[in-house]
């Protein structure tokens, strides 16, 4: 098992960011920075990091605000400007990794982390040598307008900084319907029962986000998709790999990824790759065919970092 090293950074508002890094022997080929999904944490990517390190890559993963062992308020970014803060946090980690290794940085964003990564690319794309988007969504802004309004109402009724099971059920409640009869409420995560059970048993996973996090996330998606539609801020030379399972309820598989790829290409991005894994669910890096996914990721990384 690859041994991780803990690191801390000061955020732009003086909050402390906590993360892990996994380093190869010698100078890395490049650095991969991971932006994790909702209700999980950076340490869940230990296995993926081990495969990347074995191939000569350094890997960094911090815990987004409200996530992980050191969350001040679980499932909460900030009282004000939370979306800007999490994008700025990601910039701090990317800059730290770039400065430490003086090597190209590739950003890997999964699910919620993919939306943060897409916002990062719009604002700071010149810092990236590549972008991997895992289980991302497309044309979410129409739904986001409605859901942000519901989240604002939930904040008024139950508190903006309190975990809100109603919002969790509203957003995720339909995700398991395609897998009935289901063994657990989270069968949509992976076909691998051991991975699903590990997530359920992990005390740092599965917390209910607060209404304020939903307000921040939906507002961020609205602004991010508006910027992508305009296209002028997108870095045209940055290679992008979009990947998801065909049965992922967030990306909607081929449909969602294909539409996003079409938008990126229309904006002038020169290197956009789409991979949809038949039968795969939400976490392809934790799927039954994860060895194939890891091999595909390494092949893509090796190509763009050659």
What spans do the regions from the language model cover?
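N-terminal cap/lid segment of alpha/beta-hydrolase-fold proteins
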Residues: 1-26
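Active-site glycine-rich loops that stabilize anionic/oxyanionic intermediates
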Residues: 36-40, 111, 246-247
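Conserved alpha/beta-hydrolase
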Residues: 49-74
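Conserved acidic catalytic loop of the alpha/beta-hydrolase fold
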Residues: 87-103
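Gly/Ala-rich beta-loop-alpha elbow adjacent to hydrolase catalytic centers
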Residues: 108-113, 117
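Alpha/beta-hydrolase-fold enzymes
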Residues: 117-204
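Short beta-strand/loop motif that positions the catalytic acidic residue
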Residues: 242-244
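Catalytic active-site module of serine/aspartate enzymes centered on a nucleophile-bearing elbow/loop
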Residues: 265-306
């Amino acid at each position: 098992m690859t041994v991780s090293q803990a690191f801390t950074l000061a955020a732009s508002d003086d909050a402390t960011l906590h993360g892990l890094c996994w380093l190869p022997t010698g100078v890395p080929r490049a650095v991969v920075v991971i932006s994790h999904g909702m209700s999980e944490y950076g340490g869940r990517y230990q296995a993926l990091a081990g495969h990347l390190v074995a191939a000569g890559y350094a890997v960094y993963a911090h815990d987004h605000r409200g996530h992980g062992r050191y969350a001040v308020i679980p499932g909460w970014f900030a009282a004000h400007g939370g979306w800007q803060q999490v994008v700025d946090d990601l910039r701090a980690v990317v800059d730290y990794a770039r400065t430490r290794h003086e090597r190209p940085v590739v950003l890997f964003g999964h699910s919620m982390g993919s939306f943060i990564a897409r916002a990062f690319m719009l604002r700071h794309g010149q810092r990236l040598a590549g972008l991997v988007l895992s289980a991302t969504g497309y044309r979410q802004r129409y739904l986001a307008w409605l859901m942000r309004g519901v989240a604002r109402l939930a904040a008024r009724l139950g508190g903006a900084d309190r975990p809100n099971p109603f919002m969790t059920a509203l957003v995720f409640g339909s995700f398991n319907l395609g897998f009935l009869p289901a063994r657990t409420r989270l069968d949509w995560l992976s076909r691998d029962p051991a991975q699903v059970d590990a997530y359920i048993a992990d005390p740092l996973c599965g917390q209910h986000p607060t209404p304020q996090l939903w307000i921040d996330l939906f507002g961020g998606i609205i602004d991010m998709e508006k910027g992508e539609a305009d296209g002028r801020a997108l870095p045209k030379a940055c290679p992008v790999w979009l990947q998801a399972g065909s049965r992922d309820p967030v990306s909607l598989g081929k449909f969602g990824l294909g539409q996003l790829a079409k938008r990126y290409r229309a904006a002038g991005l020169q290197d956009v790759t789409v991979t949809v894994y038949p039968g795969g669910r939400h976490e392809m890096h934790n799927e039954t065919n994860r060895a194939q996914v890891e091999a595909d990721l390494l092949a893509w990384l090796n190509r763009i970092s050659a």
